[in-house]
């Protein structure tokens, strides 16, 4: 901890290097999007079949996954609760009876000593999927709007609110890039994970902005760039330690939380790292870049006015 307190890293001086890293990650996301042919939407957004199957004895999800794959169905999701297993199939709704027979037969062959019973089947139509898609978009738009208004009000400038949302969008887009690279389906779990990442990311950003605001009042004679650098170095320990605790918990869920928590934890691991990166290497440098550009324009305007007055 003493090491972190004594460091004096020139974050702002190296801002273009960090902007380049962000740009490369965004290009990677675009490349993955093109290569995969877009986002791979799950049953929550496309519609399909939801089957609830109960076993006499508890079973492992991996064994159930193998049984479903052996029935010839590849696009599906699994979720379990005790002896009950839910199978979400992204398929044509007209073939529900065929899927029911195939899955039940395959599972019975896989678990001959564990009686299985189909508790129910639900059909999620395209209309429901479209509704959920709209709700997900509304959730993100509402979150962005609230963030802009809150940060702008707190720091008495809309610029700070806009920059904080730019950082959040940066985190979400790149997180989606890693989702695409891993060929994971976009479902409600991923939407929930991304909204959680938004919360952690904006929290880190507000902590840093608060310190910048305090130091701007205390260090009136200091250069703006120096104040930004000093503020980042001062909150560095807090940001790293807080994010590290979230990162460790997310890793625990990823490796030991089972299949249900795997996707959520995957997004949290990536999002936690990106949240720290965007706060320190994107948001703060953007504020500084805006101030530098504004001062340059102001000096040019004053110089031009002086020439005209002569």
Swiss-Prot record:
A Pfam family hit: SecD_SecF_C
Main location group: membrane
A GO cellular component annotation in the UniProt record: plasma membrane
> Which UniProt keywords are given for this protein, alphabetically ordered?
Cell inner membrane, Cell membrane, Membrane, Protein transport, Translocation, Transmembrane, Transmembrane helix, Transport
In the record, what terms sit under GO molecular function?
Answer: protein-transporting ATPase activity
Record field: transmembrane: 18-38, 135-155, 162-182, 188-208, 240-260, 267-287
Output the SUPFAM superfamilies linked to this UniProt entry.
Answer: Multidrug efflux transporter AcrB transmembrane domain
Q: Which domain of life is it from?
A: Bacteria
Q: Which GO terms describe its biological process?
A: intracellular protein transmembrane transport; protein targeting; protein transport by the Sec complex
The cellular location(s) given in this protein's UniProt record come to: Cell inner membrane
Stated membrane topology is: Multi-pass membrane protein
Q: Explain the purpose of this protein.
A: Part of the Sec protein translocase complex. Interacts with the SecYEG preprotein conducting channel. SecDF uses the proton motive force (PMF) to complete protein translocation after the ATP-dependent function of SecA.
Listed PANTHER family: PROTEIN TRANSLOCASE SUBUNIT SECF (PTHR30081:SF8), PROTEIN-EXPORT MEMBRANE PROTEIN SEC (PTHR30081)
The UniProt entry's sequence similarity note says: Belongs to the SecD/SecF family. SecF subfamily.
Q: How does it assemble?
A: Forms a complex with SecD. Part of the essential Sec protein translocation apparatus which comprises SecA, SecYEG and auxiliary proteins SecDF. Other proteins may also be involved.
Protein name per its UniProtKB record: Protein translocase subunit SecF
């Amino acid at each position: 901890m003493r090491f972190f307190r004594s460091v004096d890293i020139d974050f702002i001086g190296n801002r273009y290097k960090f902007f380049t890293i962000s740009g490369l990650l965004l290009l990677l996301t675009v490349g993955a999007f093109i290569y995969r042919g877009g986002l791979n939407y799950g049953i929550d957004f496309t519609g399909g079949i939801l089957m609830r199957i109960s076993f006499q004895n508890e079973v492992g999800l991996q064994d159930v996954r193998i049984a479903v794959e052996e029935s010839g169905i590849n696009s599906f999701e699994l979720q379990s609760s005790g002896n009950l297993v839910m199978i979400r199939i992204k398929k044509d709704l007209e073939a529900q009876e065929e899927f029911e027979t195939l899955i039940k037969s395959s599972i019975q062959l896989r678990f001959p000593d564990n009686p299985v019973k189909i508790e129910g089947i639900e059909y999620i139509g395209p209309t429901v999927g479209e509704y959920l898609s709209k709700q997900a978009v509304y959730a993100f738009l509402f979150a962005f709007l609230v963030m802009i208004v809150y940060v702008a009000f707190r720091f008495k400038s809309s610029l700070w609110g806009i920059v904080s949302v730019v950082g959040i969008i940066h985190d979400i887009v790149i997180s989606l890039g890693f989702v695409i690279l891993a060929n994971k389906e976009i479902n409600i779990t991923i939407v929930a994970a991304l909204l959680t990442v938004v919360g952690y990311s904006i929290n880190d950003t507000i902590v840093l902005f608060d310190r910048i605001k305090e130091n701007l009042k205390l260090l009136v004679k200091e250069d703006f760039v120096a104040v930004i650098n000093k503020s980042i170095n001062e909150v560095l320990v807090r940001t790293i330690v807080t994010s590290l605790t979230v990162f460790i918990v997310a890793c625990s869920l990823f490796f030991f939380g089972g299949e249900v928590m795997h996707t959520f934890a995957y997004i949290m691991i990536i999002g936690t790292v990106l949240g720290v990166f965007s706060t320190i290497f994107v948001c703060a440098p953007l504020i500084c870049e805006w101030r530098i550009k504004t001062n340059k324009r102001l000096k040019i305007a004053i110089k031009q006015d002086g020439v005209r007055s002569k």
